[in-house]
Amino acid sequence: MKYSKITTTLAALALPSIAHAHVGLHADGTLAGLNHPFSGLDHILAMVAVGFWASTLGGKAVWIVPSAFVIVMAGGGVLGIEGIALPMVETAIALTVAMLGLLVAFEVKIPTPVAAIVVGICALFHGHVHGIELPTMSNATGYVAGFLAATVILHVLGIGLASLRFGKAGQVVARVAGGAVALAGAALLVG
């Protein structure tokens, strides 16, 4: 009886290797999408800052603000994939990085719905850039799912980092980090 369970378990573990008949058909888009937000400092800084700022707002903002970002970014991604242009996208992205850094640095408190709109505007441009950079031959649905998942990871990282800001030293570090993000956004604007 024991032999049968071991054999069955080993056979079951081997089955997934048989199921690779469609390698790359869907994974390429998903992996490219997962990678894209991590390929640019502007995206990393903005998305971590969104999570951080949402955490400082507290309450329902911790999940509403990042969720608004992800939802609107998906729409922006679709616009980019469809080739629908937005004005001054790169400038807007640099401005969003600077603005989000300032929101973190000064621990700006605004109502959650307003914060969701603010990050939604930022997300539209970030999503648009992700969409227009869809790699050739990639699965668009997988690509969008990938960059949305990566965004959630970066938001969670920001929320986690914000949890370290307690005490005077933590608050100073948070303000300096927010200022550094704002300066990075300004640097993106000029160069």
From Swiss-Prot:
GO cellular component, one term: plasma membrane
Signal peptide boundaries: 1-21
Cell location: Cell inner membrane
Pfam families xrefs: HupE_UreJ (PF04955)
Membrane-protein topology: Multi-pass membrane protein
Domain of life: Bacteria
Main location: membrane
TM segment ranges: 38-58, 61-81, 84-104, 114-134, 144-164, 170-190
UniProt entry keywords in alphabetical sequence: Cell inner membrane, Cell membrane, Membrane, Signal, Transmembrane, Transmembrane helix
InterPro entries cross-referenced by the UniProt entry: HupE_UreJ
Role of this protein: Needed for full hydrogenase activity.
The protein's name in its UniProt record: Protein HupE
Lineage summary: Bacteria, Pseudomonadati, Pseudomonadota, Alphaproteobacteria, Hyphomicrobiales
